[in-house]
Amino acid sequence: MTFKDNKADDITCLVGIKYEGENSWYVKTDKSNTVYLVSNSGVSFAMNDELSYVNKSTLVASYDSENDTVNRVRVERKDLEKDIVLDKLPEETEKEFSSTYVAYEMSSHNGILADDELDKKVIYGLFGISASDVFAVSPTDEQKKQAGLDDPDCTVTMVRNEETVTKLTLGSAVYTVTKNDETGEEIKTITGYYGMLSGKDAIYVFSPDSLPWLTATPENMLYKLFLTPYIYYLDGVTIYDSDRKAYDFTISGDADKSSFTYEGKEVDSAKFKAFYQYLLSAYAEQIYLDDLTDDNKFIAGITYDHREEGKENDVVEFYSSESDRTCIIVVNGDVRYKVRQVYATRLLENLNALL
């Protein structure tokens, strides 16, 4: 062992054989012929495999809520039809959903909203990540191939603070093999995955529990209440029936004093508020990105007229789906979701009851 620092000459310690009958080793330095007995605890650190000296903890700095902003996370995985790309919403858009935990959209999937409670591990999982083991340092091409990193199954790329890029590449699974005592059958259990981090010239083993990107799907991060404008941020709402006949409702006032009118006549406030709550209850049950066809018939529509100057109207349309008891939701011209068809049916029933 050679010890080096900037304040003294290098010192090399030579460790000999273990002293018989004692938990000690013969040790001398290159500066002296004196031989010492040093306890096992004093030299055991030098007896380990070289990989045991590689740091495995907090390979990426922990998240700092004051200084860190995650701008984008991209998940590439072989079993996905397309990459998942989560982008931070502009602050003014995020504020619209400040009470409903929406800060990211899936720009890869027509800008559908992601639920912050469901996507948290995917967004922030690289911060503070630690490995359970080290497979190789300065790995060769052969070692990368052995670990499945020549053709990775999953790649995660995080962009934070506009310019800092962190990439995690994941390869083959690591197994432990046990035998069933009764049948003798071998049982393989996944205990980790080989992976490499940008800026780290090593192949690590990561626990499956620390890798949410291996199972993440757009559906399990979907924010289901996809459009929830506050009623008093609107000047009006227009409902369209299956014949595209328009029913225009005007909204005036605020939470303290308000009124709602249809064709110049005031509508019962409690009834209209209940109707509006139903409009917001459309619950996206799955993502649907296919283009509409002639078989998808228009069922109903909603236009939200925002009070804020310069803010464009939001338009939600419902179309029939030929394959199941759902209808297709188009938001501002983009096909995005499916919802149970009964929602659109009851929407028109509730409209008739209000009138």
Feature roles, as predicted:
Residues 1-355:
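Soluble, acidic/polar mature domains that operate outside membranes
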